[in-house]
């Protein structure tokens, strides 16, 4: 897979951007607040239909404009394909080769990206919600249908919570119907997460062993809370039954609190180092190495599953890594042959990922300019 062309119109602070990215590294350099992260987010939004940062869709539209549009032309398995997404009025529309996409699966059609941001480096010491989001982005990259499936679960959860807030006046028959819907949708989420972890965790653990600077082994694990039974061996039907049982057992508590306390939305990813919680006991450098190991494993896992490398998006990550681990990452990017778009405030930090065909960009005040020379711009 290769991104051949990118056109961005009125996305965040970017009025117009037209690029022919390098087949290898495209590096955007600029000070904070100038728009380099917005360029990366435009690409991420194009490939996933989800913003890279939390917020409303309306925030993606440049101030004073009616709508935003991002268009990308890709080479996929020898054939060119154009996808586009428009945002306006708080909604988004997706297009494939100039026509409205018939489904999410039709839209994605093999386009895959892996994003790596400074916020990701804080995942290990963050809260469960950040680790769930981190896991679910990886699940979506591996199984694009997960976007639709997670939305189905979110709708079912919202409906059940609405009924729970009615307290003891709620009709048990209605609640049972919502429990059934939620259990089936939740079982699918469990199954997707479990499948991804089975593929990715061993790779991440092996990568960490080479960069962690410790003999302590890393273990990444996902095991839902409040489920009784053999999670590892259960099929989706059994998982749904396990979730239904947990929903029933916690019904009184849920009615008192007005929300659903069990399900995929309340789970966590366990990361341990030498058998101890990495969140509590690992150093900051080790925590970041654990995340770096995960991201490299995600890239390698997607290549193994799809037969090609995803597009890589790195947002000023180098400034947050120590020199040794940054050198490891830059060397990996250069050797992998992947197409990568990086942002940085200092071009010297990412020189290790550059090649003769690297496209260097200067970003200032929402304007993106291609540098005529091949040398990285000096640090300011």
From Swiss-Prot:
Example GO biological process: DNA synthesis involved in DNA repair
Q: Which SUPFAM superfamilies match?
A: P-loop containing nucleoside triphosphate hydrolases
One Pfam family, please name it. SMC_N
Q: Which UniProt keywords apply?
A: ATP-binding, Cytoplasm, DNA damage, DNA repair, DNA replication, DNA-binding, Nucleotide-binding, SOS response
Which cellular component appears as one GO term in the record? Answer: cytoplasm
> Which InterPro entries does the UniProt record give?
DNA-binding_RecF, DNA-binding_RecF_CS, P-loop_NTPase, RecF/RecN/SMC_N, RecF_2
Q: Does the keyword DNA damage apply?
A: yes
* Role played: The RecF protein is involved in DNA metabolism; it is required for DNA replication and normal SOS inducibility. RecF binds preferentially to single-stranded, linear DNA. It also seems to bind ATP.
Q: Where in the cell is it found?
A: Cytoplasm
Matching PROSITE patterns? RECF_2 (PS00618)
GO MF assignments: ATP binding; single-stranded DNA binding
Hey, which family's this protein in? Belongs to the RecF family.
Origin species, per record, is: Myxococcus xanthus (strain DK1622)
Q: Which PANTHER family match?
A: DNA REPLICATION AND REPAIR PROTEIN RECF
Name this polypeptide is given = DNA replication and repair protein RecF
Q: Which domain of life is it from?
A: Bacteria
The UniProt record gives the binding positions of ATP as 30-37
């Amino acid at each position: 897979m290769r991104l051949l062309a990118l056109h961005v119109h009125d996305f965040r602070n970017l009025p117009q951007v037209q690029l022919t990215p390098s087949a290898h590294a495209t590096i955007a350099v600029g000070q904070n607040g100038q728009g380099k992260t917005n360029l990366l987010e435009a690409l991420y939004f194009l490939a996933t239909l989800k913003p890279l940062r939390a917020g409303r869709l309306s925030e993606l539209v440049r101030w004073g404009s009616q709508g935003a549009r991002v268009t990308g032309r890709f080479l996929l398995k020898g054939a060119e394909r154009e996808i586009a997404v428009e945002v306006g009025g708080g909604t988004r529309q997706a297009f494939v080769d100039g026509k409205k996409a018939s489904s999410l699966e039709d839209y994605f059609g093999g386009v895959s990206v892996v994003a790596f941001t400074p916020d990701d480096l804080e995942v290990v010491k963050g809260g469960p919600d950040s680790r769930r989001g981190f896991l679910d982005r990886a699940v979506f990259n591996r199984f694009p249908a997960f976007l639709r499936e997670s939305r189905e679960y979110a709708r079912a959860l919202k409906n059940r919570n609405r009924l729970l807030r009615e307290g003891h006046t709620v009709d048990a028959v209605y609640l049972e119907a919502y429990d059934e819907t939620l259990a089936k949708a939740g079982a699918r989420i469990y199954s997707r997460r479990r499948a991804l972890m089975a593929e990715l965790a061993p790779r991440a653990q092996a990568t960490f062993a080479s960069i962690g600077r410790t003999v302590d082994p890393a273990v990444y694990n996902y095991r839902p809370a409040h489920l009784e039974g053999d999670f590892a061996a259960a099929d989706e039907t059994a998982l749904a039954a396990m979730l239904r049982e947990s929903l029933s057992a916690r019904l009184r508590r849920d009615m008192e609190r007005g929300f659903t306390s069990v399900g995929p939305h309340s789970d966590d990813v366990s990361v341990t180092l030498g058998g101890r919680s990495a969140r509590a006991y690992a150093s900051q450098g080790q925590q970041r190495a654990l995340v770096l190991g995960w991201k490299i494993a995600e890239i390698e896992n997607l290549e193994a599953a799809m037969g090609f490398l995803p597009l890589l998006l790195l947002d000023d990550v180098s400034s947050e890594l120590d020199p040794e681990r940054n050198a490891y990452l830059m060397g990996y990017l250069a050797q992998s042959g992947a197409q990568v778009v990086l942002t940085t405030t200092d071009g010297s930090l990412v020189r290790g990922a550059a090649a003769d065909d690297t496209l260097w960009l200067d970003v200032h005040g929402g304007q993106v300019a291609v540098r005529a020379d091949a040398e990285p711009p000096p640090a300011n």
